[in-house]
């Protein structure tokens, strides 16, 4: 998963 998946 990319950082964007965690909303960062």
Swiss-Prot record:
<feature type="modified residue" description="Leucine amide">
    <location>
        <position position="8"/>
    </location>
</feature>
<comment type="function">
    <text>May act as a neurotransmitter or neuromodulator.</text>
</comment>
<dbReference type="GO" id="GO:0007218">
    <property type="term" value="P:neuropeptide signaling pathway"/>
</dbReference>
<dbReference type="GO" id="GO:0005576">
    <property type="term" value="C:extracellular region"/>
</dbReference>
<keyword id="KW-0527">Neuropeptide</keyword>
<protein>
    <recommendedName>
        <fullName>Carcinustatin-7</fullName>
    </recommendedName>
</protein>
<keyword id="KW-0027">Amidation</keyword>
<comment type="similarity">
    <text>Belongs to the allatostatin family.</text>
</comment>
<keyword id="KW-0964">Secreted</keyword>
